[in-house]
Amino acid sequence: MSGSRVRIGIAGLGRMGARHARNLALRCPGAELVAACSPVAAERAWAKDELGVGTTYADYPSLLGHPGLDAVAIVTPTSEHASNIIAALDAGLHVFSEKPTSLLVADCLRVEAAAARRPDRVVLIGYVRRFDASYRDAFAKVRDGAIGTPFMVRSQTIDMNDPSGFFVRFAPTSGGIFCDMSVHDIDAARWFLGGAKAERVFATGTVAIHEGLKACGDLDNGVALCEFEGGKVAMFVASRTAAHGHESMTSVVGTAGRLEIGANPRATRVEIADAHGVRSECTPTYYERFEDAFIAEVNAFVAAVCEGVPLPVTLHDATEATRIAVALQRSIAEHRAVDV
């Protein structure tokens, strides 16, 4: 497709879908957002009025049949990702999908098989940290031997407490805190550890504030350990109850040094010095922290479609992230270490 714009349709216009739609329409020169799909009439109207999307649909099969479509961006509920990806591939389309591929390893493998039948189609699962400038710089340093051989990763995702209860309502279909939040940390750990194969995991946690999570067996704070082949290890921390804001931090330890990404979650380079001391404001949410990476992600997808530019994450990577996250959720449920 070299030299032409990729005609993309987006499925899902909720909180994250609207952000992806805006990026595709306004911040991705190689793409043309030609269609959108949502069962919610107000969301379809927003896509037309705010982004100038010419055609909207209430159902996904109709979107797949849009004339001249090259690709789809899937930002539907996680439980629908795998079937949506496979249907798009069967329709001959390139696919970008939000993470994870699925909450079931078997469905991830079905997606891999469907993609193998269409090697001429690009499929990208949105593990956005692989497109973040700081994470990419850190990976290049690790790859080039700056800290020797990496053997340990500590990675955390911490969100500001949301008293509205949004994620409590979302929790029953999220797969749990490790599938929803820590899956980014899991993918980052495998990336920095050279795609190492996980062998055993253990997870624990608590409900510190949001009692409603107990109804579906979820947590608002969790910690996990993962043992990889060759003696490599990773620790993951997830929290939904921070008072200060969003924090994504990854530490990689090697035989000759250590590096950290995001150790200070400051929103800007401004510091305030007053009677309370010296302080800086924190990044409020994950989107402010990774907004540029989300833009880079969709542009990388378009470059892969148009020019065959290699992508930094594979379907196998996405499957392994799900495999580890699911094992962590099982560890929570069974109160024991679990083989992966």
Predicted regions and their residues:
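Conserved SAM-binding strand-loop segment of SAM-dependent methyltransferases
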Residues: 53-60
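Beta-strand-loop-alpha-helix segment that lines the small-molecule cofactor/substrate pocket
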Residues: 2, 66, 71-130, 145
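Short, Asp-centered acidic motifs that coordinate Mg2+ and/or phosphate
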Residues: 35, 55, 71, 122, ...
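C-terminal helix-rich "cap/oligomerization" subdomain common to oxidoreductases
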Residues: 1-5, 71-74, 300-340
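Residues forming the Rossmann-fold NAD(P)(H) cofactor-binding site
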Residues: 18-21, 82, 183
